[in-house]
Amino acid sequence: MAIVSAEKFVQAARKNGYAVGGFNTNNLEWTQAILRAAEAKQAPVLIQTSMGAAKYMGGYKVCQSLITNLVESMGITVPVAIHLDHGHYEDALECIEVGYTSIMFDGSHLPVEENLAKTAEVVKIAHAKGVSVEAEVGTIGGEEDGIIGKGELAPIEDAKAMVETGIDFLAAGIGNIHGPYPENWEGLALDHLEKLTAAVPGFPIVLHGGSGIPDDQIKEAIRLGVAKVNVNTESQIAFSNATREFARNYEANEAEYDGKKLFDPRKFLAPGMKAVQGAVEERIDVFGSANKA
């Protein structure tokens, strides 16, 4: 299966009552881990780059080339979309130009009418090149590349207006946040999600901040209409924990590890890479997208 737009497989998820994962990558190893997990689970997947991660990796063209060539060299057979996560207007246009197959234009920080107008412009440009479009109403809590939100509930009328711009899937605040959830978090506003999906029947909703939400709430959100769940923090924590454990073991057994040449960065990064793959596979199972390729 070639790299594709996300439109068809996100729509299929919405229609059939499961969700696909949008997994953020940060480097070569993360990309390989996500692809291996998707292939092992035979699940369609979006590999996402935030603006910050793309800058770190060398730019959008580098990211697009890396993912495209890894899909080919690794013999990946499942559908893979290359997706921009929380992109500004100029970034969205650049990603369309360099070959991303899906983009999120995040104008949630703009006045509603300006957000709608710019989203409509992006949709026209993207769809002309077969690129799927995600947009956001309200703001998702937490911080994502300088955009800070408090976890508000997306206004229903704004959501309906955003869908009318022609987007393919909609990110809407339902009490979710980016990053670790605080102990006093009240949970997803599932009653609001139910009202939202009733207002835009059959339309795919995106759940951002998927890391740390209890599985039962995620599954209920999927039942109510969520068709894409974004994951980043969970993978970061898995990578960090595995790498720290390896480093602690190295320090305790330095002579032995040196003898095995475990200072080789390929070996040093391997435990974290394996942990990311495991985290992605586990999320795919929860989302119900295994064997849906």
UniProtKB/Swiss-Prot annotation:
One Gene Ontology term of the molecular function aspect:
zinc ion binding
GO BP terms: fructose 1,6-bisphosphate metabolic process; glycolytic process
**Sites where the protein binds dihydroxyacetone phosphate:** 179, 209-211, 230-233
Q: Catalyses which reaction?
A: beta-D-fructose 1,6-bisphosphate = D-glyceraldehyde 3-phosphate + dihydroxyacetone phosphate
Q: In which pathway does it act?
A: Carbohydrate degradation; glycolysis; D-glyceraldehyde 3-phosphate and glycerone phosphate from D-glucose: step 4/4
- Any idea which positions bind Zn(2+) 1? 86, 178, 208
Record note on cofactor: Binds 2 Zn(2+) ions per subunit. One is catalytic and the other provides a structural contribution.
Required cofactor names? Zn(2+)
Could you say which residues bind D-glyceraldehyde 3-phosphate here?
Answer: 50
What residues form the catalytic site here?
85
Q: Which InterPro entries match?
A: Aldolase_TIM, Class_II_FBP_aldolase, FBA_II, Fruc_bis_ald_class-2
Q: Which superkingdom heads the taxonomic lineage of this protein's source?
A: Bacteria
Family annotation (CDD domains)? TBP_aldolase_IIB
UniProt xrefs under Gene3D superfamilies: Aldolase class I (3.20.20.70)
Q: Where does Zn(2+) 2 bind?
A: 106, 136
Q: What does this protein do?
A: Catalyzes the aldol condensation of dihydroxyacetone phosphate (DHAP or glycerone-phosphate) with glyceraldehyde 3-phosphate (G3P) to form fructose 1,6-bisphosphate (FBP) in gluconeogenesis and the reverse reaction in glycolysis.
Q: Which family does it belong to?
A: Belongs to the class II fructose-bisphosphate aldolase family.
Official protein name in the record? Fructose-bisphosphate aldolase
Say which species the protein is native to.
Streptococcus pyogenes serotype M3 (strain ATCC BAA-595 / MGAS315)
